[in-house]
Amino acid sequence: MLLTTTDVLQGREVERYLGIVTAEVVYGTNVLRDFLASLRNIIGGRTRTYEEVLENAQKKVLEELEQRAKRLGANGILGVSIHTNMSATMILVTAAGTAVKLR
């Protein structure tokens, strides 16, 4: 499966557009992790705890997007975008793209 943020893949031709695919991953926040992250923010530096959560969420959302595209018979997804939203109680990562059958 080829995923790209662009609308075309150089050297590949789109045989058929199969539709928009979307995926979502939601993680609840953790009180201890939040406390440790806030301490890190006070003394400065990166909060690796949240970076790891976001990294994992992005990986999972792309895996889910790929699975949904495969169910449509796609072997590529064009125009992939990933968005992250955080609130006091959750982290939401969404992804979307156009499933295609490439030659």
UniProtKB/Swiss-Prot annotation:
<dbReference type="InterPro" id="IPR035439">
    <property type="entry name" value="UPF0145_dom_sf"/>
</dbReference>
<dbReference type="InterPro" id="IPR002765">
    <property type="entry name" value="UPF0145_YbjQ-like"/>
</dbReference>
<protein>
    <recommendedName>
        <fullName>UPF0145 protein CYA_2258</fullName>
    </recommendedName>
</protein>
<comment type="similarity">
    <text>Belongs to the UPF0145 family.</text>
</comment>
<dbReference type="Pfam" id="PF01906">
    <property type="entry name" value="YbjQ_1"/>
</dbReference>
